[in-house]
Amino acid sequence: MSQTPREATPAQQSRRAARELAVQGLYQWQMTGKSITAVESEFRAQIADEDLEDHENWHKVMGIADLALFHELLHNVAADREAIDKTIAPLLDRRLEDLDRIELAILRLGAYELKYRLEVPYRAVINEGIELAKAFGATDGHKYVNGILDKLASRLRSAEVAARRR
C-alpha cells in the first residue's frame, strides 16, 4: 500500500523529532546562556525523569528522534552561530536581537541546514521551519519564518531553487 503525500515515513518522523528537540535546545541555550553540552545533557537526562510533568510525550519524542541528528544540529548551529547570524541579518526587517527567541532558533536551524546539509532539499528545510514555527512560535510566526527561509534559500541554493521553479 502506498503512502499518501501527507504521511511522514518513520525516517521523516525521526528527523522532525530531532529538529523539534534541536529548536527547543537552541531556545534554552539562547535564554539561559548554558553551554550547549549542558543543554544536551539535560535533554537526555529528562528521558529517565518519571516525575517530569510531560514525561510520556517527552519520552515518545526522544524515543523516535534521530539523536545523532539532534546532536549535530544542536552543536553545529551553536558553533556556527556568528556566521549563521551574519547570513540571516540582511534578510530581516528588524534587528536580530528584536526577533522572537523561538523564531530566531528556528531561523538559525533552517539557515544551518540550507548552508551545510545539502542532501536535504531546500523545500523540506523551509517546510520544517514552517511546521516548527506553527508548533512553537507566535500566531503568525510561521509566515515570517517562511519568508526569511525562502529568501535565504534563493541566496544559498540558487541553482536548486531555479531548477525547482522551471
Curated annotation (Swiss-Prot):
It comes from the Bacteria. SUPFAM superfamilies: NusB-like. Keywords: RNA-binding, Transcription, Transcription antitermination, Transcription regulation. The keyword Isomerase does not apply. HAMAP family: NusB. It comes from Chromohalobacter salexigens (strain ATCC BAA-138 / DSM 3043 / CIP 106854 / NCIMB 13768 / 1H11). Involved in transcription antitermination. Required for transcription of ribosomal RNA (rRNA) genes. Binds specifically to the boxA antiterminator sequence of the ribosomal RNA (rrn) operons. GO terms for molecular function: RNA binding. GO terms for biological process: DNA-templated transcription termination; transcription antitermination. Belongs to the NusB family. GO terms for cellular component: cytosol. InterPro entries: NusB-like_sf (IPR035926), NusB_fam (IPR011605), NusB_RsmB_TIM44 (IPR006027). This is Transcription antitermination protein NusB. Signal peptide: none annotated. The keyword RNA-binding applies.
